[in-house]
C-alpha cells in the first residue's frame, strides 16, 4: 500500500499545471481557449488590413465581417473596371470570353500580405495564428 500526503494531490502533469510550458502540444480541439485566441488574432488582423475599419474605435466581430465583405466587393468592382479587364470583355465576336480572369495578381498580393504578417514579432502572433490567418 502506497502512502500519500493528504495535502498534496498526485498529478501527472504537475509541471504543465504551473504554466512552465512543459506539456504536450494541444490541437485547437483539445484547447478551445487556444482556438478562441487564434480567432481573435484573425479578427485583429482583418481589422488592420481593411482600411474602412476605424483603428481607434472598438468594433464588434459582426462589424468587422461587414467591413470585410464591403471591402471585397469594392475590390471586385475596382478589378472589374480596370482597363485591362474592360478590354477583355470587349473582344471581337467569335472569340470565347472567360467568365473570370486569373487571380494571379491577387495571389501575389496575398503572398505579399503573408510576408508582411510574418514580420510581426512572435510575441504578437503565435505560430498557430500565423497558420490560421497568414
Curated annotation (Swiss-Prot):
<dbReference type="GO" id="GO:0014003">
    <property type="term" value="P:oligodendrocyte development"/>
</dbReference>
<dbReference type="GO" id="GO:0048667">
    <property type="term" value="P:cell morphogenesis involved in neuron differentiation"/>
</dbReference>
<dbReference type="GO" id="GO:0090398">
    <property type="term" value="P:cellular senescence"/>
</dbReference>
<dbReference type="GO" id="GO:0045600">
    <property type="term" value="P:positive regulation of fat cell differentiation"/>
</dbReference>
<dbReference type="GO" id="GO:0060749">
    <property type="term" value="P:mammary gland alveolus development"/>
</dbReference>
<dbReference type="GO" id="GO:0043153">
    <property type="term" value="P:entrainment of circadian clock by photoperiod"/>
</dbReference>
<dbReference type="GO" id="GO:0030183">
    <property type="term" value="P:B cell differentiation"/>
</dbReference>
<dbReference type="GO" id="GO:0061031">
    <property type="term" value="P:endodermal digestive tract morphogenesis"/>
</dbReference>
<dbReference type="GO" id="GO:2000177">
    <property type="term" value="P:regulation of neural precursor cell proliferation"/>
</dbReference>
<dbReference type="GO" id="GO:0003149">
    <property type="term" value="P:membranous septum morphogenesis"/>
</dbReference>
<dbReference type="GO" id="GO:0010629">
    <property type="term" value="P:negative regulation of gene expression"/>
</dbReference>
<keyword id="KW-0678">Repressor</keyword>
<dbReference type="InterPro" id="IPR011598">
    <property type="entry name" value="bHLH_dom"/>
</dbReference>
<dbReference type="GO" id="GO:0021772">
    <property type="term" value="P:olfactory bulb development"/>
</dbReference>
<dbReference type="GO" id="GO:0048708">
    <property type="term" value="P:astrocyte differentiation"/>
</dbReference>
<dbReference type="GO" id="GO:0005737">
    <property type="term" value="C:cytoplasm"/>
</dbReference>
<dbReference type="GO" id="GO:0048715">
    <property type="term" value="P:negative regulation of oligodendrocyte differentiation"/>
</dbReference>
<dbReference type="GO" id="GO:0048469">
    <property type="term" value="P:cell maturation"/>
</dbReference>
<dbReference type="GO" id="GO:0048541">
    <property type="term" value="P:Peyer's patch development"/>
</dbReference>
<dbReference type="GO" id="GO:2000045">
    <property type="term" value="P:regulation of G1/S transition of mitotic cell cycle"/>
</dbReference>
<comment type="subunit">
    <text>Interacts with GATA4 and NKX2-5. Interacts with NR0B2. Interacts with CLOCK and BMAL1. Interacts with IFI204. Interacts with NEDD9/HEF1. Interacts with ASB4; this interaction promotes ID2 proteasomal degradation.</text>
</comment>
<dbReference type="GO" id="GO:0045651">
    <property type="term" value="P:positive regulation of macrophage differentiation"/>
</dbReference>
<dbReference type="GO" id="GO:0045578">
    <property type="term" value="P:negative regulation of B cell differentiation"/>
</dbReference>
<feature type="region of interest" description="Disordered">
    <location>
        <begin position="1"/>
        <end position="24"/>
    </location>
</feature>
<protein>
    <recommendedName>
        <fullName>DNA-binding protein inhibitor ID-2</fullName>
    </recommendedName>
</protein>
<keyword id="KW-0090">Biological rhythms</keyword>
<dbReference type="GO" id="GO:0048557">
    <property type="term" value="P:embryonic digestive tract morphogenesis"/>
</dbReference>
<keyword id="KW-0804">Transcription</keyword>
<keyword id="KW-0597">Phosphoprotein</keyword>
<keyword id="KW-0832">Ubl conjugation</keyword>
<dbReference type="GO" id="GO:0045893">
    <property type="term" value="P:positive regulation of DNA-templated transcription"/>
</dbReference>
<dbReference type="GO" id="GO:0010468">
    <property type="term" value="P:regulation of gene expression"/>
</dbReference>
<dbReference type="GO" id="GO:0048661">
    <property type="term" value="P:positive regulation of smooth muscle cell proliferation"/>
</dbReference>
<dbReference type="GO" id="GO:0050872">
    <property type="term" value="P:white fat cell differentiation"/>
</dbReference>
<dbReference type="GO" id="GO:0042752">
    <property type="term" value="P:regulation of circadian rhythm"/>
</dbReference>
<dbReference type="GO" id="GO:0045648">
    <property type="term" value="P:positive regulation of erythrocyte differentiation"/>
</dbReference>
<dbReference type="GO" id="GO:0060612">
    <property type="term" value="P:adipose tissue development"/>
</dbReference>
<dbReference type="GO" id="GO:0061629">
    <property type="term" value="F:RNA polymerase II-specific DNA-binding transcription factor binding"/>
</dbReference>
<dbReference type="GO" id="GO:0051148">
    <property type="term" value="P:negative regulation of muscle cell differentiation"/>
</dbReference>
<dbReference type="GO" id="GO:0032991">
    <property type="term" value="C:protein-containing complex"/>
</dbReference>
<keyword id="KW-0963">Cytoplasm</keyword>
<dbReference type="GO" id="GO:0005829">
    <property type="term" value="C:cytosol"/>
</dbReference>
Amino acid at each position: 500500500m502506497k502512502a500519500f500526503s493528504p495535502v498534496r494531490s498526485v498529478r501527472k502533469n504537475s509541471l504543465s499545471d504551473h504554466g512552465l510550458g512543459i506539456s504536450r502540444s494541444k490541437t485547437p480541439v483539445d484547447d478551445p481557449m487556444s482556438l478562441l485566441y487564434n480567432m481573435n488574432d484573425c479578427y485583429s488582423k482583418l481589422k488592420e488590413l481593411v482600411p474602412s475599419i476605424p483603428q481607434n474605435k472598438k468594433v464588434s466581430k459582426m462589424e468587422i465581417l461587414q467591413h470585410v465583405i464591403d471591402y471585397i466587393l469594392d475590390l471586385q468592382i475596382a478589378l472589374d473596371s480596370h482597363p485591362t479587364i474592360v478590354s477583355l470583355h470587349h473582344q471581337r465576336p467569335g472569340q470565347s470570353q472567360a467568365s473570370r480572369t486569373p487571380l494571379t495578381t491577387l495571389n501575389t498580393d496575398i503572398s505579399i500580405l503573408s510576408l508582411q504578417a510574418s514580420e510581426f514579432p512572435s510575441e504578437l502572433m503565435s505560430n498557430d495564428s500565423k497558420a490560421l490567418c497568414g
